[in-house]
Amino acid sequence: MPILAKRVLFIDAEAMIIDKPAGLPVTSVRDGSLSLENYLASLCFGFKRWPSIVHRLDRDTSGCLLLARNPKMHRRLSEAFSQGQVKKCYWAILEGVPEKNEGIIDLPLLKISSPKSGWRIVADDKGKRAVTHWEILAKNKGRSLVAFRPETGRTHQLRVHAATGLGLPIVGDPFYGSHKDENISRMMLHAHSLEIARLEKKPITAEAPLPKAFTDLGF
């Protein structure tokens, strides 16, 4: 059982941000694994009502995850996400180094599915608008640590934009990666920071420290 109460990065009467560990699903999954939903009772901190999940991170993605502490705030925060009012920054280790130091990926994304392979996201002009700003933070042994700041919030956006837009998949990505490495324990995608402005109050904001899996690869 992950001790999530010790992974709180921000908390006040309205919201909290936790550092979600990689491998923990946000909501229930078909394989029966425990998810964040199973641990919400441990995050009440004196409130009778459990906090509610405002947005999702992929199971293998770690880092900043926002929870609301009352229904009214949940509606406001959900609206902020849907209207693109949330500042998000993700850090990822890529299989290679981009030719430029920074740039913008403007690549529409479409969800496709088949009985044999299931569903996945692909770059397609018929898809929904998806825009990501990126910049290189560090390089090491043929790989790069890249900061991604998405303008939009499409499913698997950063994973597909890295693999297709930059031609460099995220290390450890089981769906969009080019090869498997037995020495890689997880997908190297981390929700580094999150910020939401509030009227007449300080912003809801936090930064999640770089996981050990990243530092083990020299970053």
Curated annotation (Swiss-Prot):
<dbReference type="GO" id="GO:0009982">
    <property type="term" value="F:pseudouridine synthase activity"/>
</dbReference>
<keyword id="KW-0413">Isomerase</keyword>
<dbReference type="InterPro" id="IPR050188">
    <property type="entry name" value="RluA_PseudoU_synthase"/>
</dbReference>
<comment type="similarity">
    <text>Belongs to the pseudouridine synthase RluA family.</text>
</comment>
<dbReference type="GO" id="GO:0140098">
    <property type="term" value="F:catalytic activity, acting on RNA"/>
</dbReference>
<feature type="active site">
    <location>
        <position position="58"/>
    </location>
</feature>
<dbReference type="GO" id="GO:0003723">
    <property type="term" value="F:RNA binding"/>
</dbReference>
<dbReference type="InterPro" id="IPR006224">
    <property type="entry name" value="PsdUridine_synth_RluA-like_CS"/>
</dbReference>
<dbReference type="GO" id="GO:0000455">
    <property type="term" value="P:enzyme-directed rRNA pseudouridine synthesis"/>
</dbReference>
<dbReference type="Pfam" id="PF00849">
    <property type="entry name" value="PseudoU_synth_2"/>
</dbReference>
<dbReference type="InterPro" id="IPR020103">
    <property type="entry name" value="PsdUridine_synth_cat_dom_sf"/>
</dbReference>
<protein>
    <recommendedName>
        <fullName>Uncharacterized RNA pseudouridine synthase ZMO0505</fullName>
        <ecNumber>5.4.99.-</ecNumber>
    </recommendedName>
</protein>
<dbReference type="InterPro" id="IPR006145">
    <property type="entry name" value="PsdUridine_synth_RsuA/RluA"/>
</dbReference>
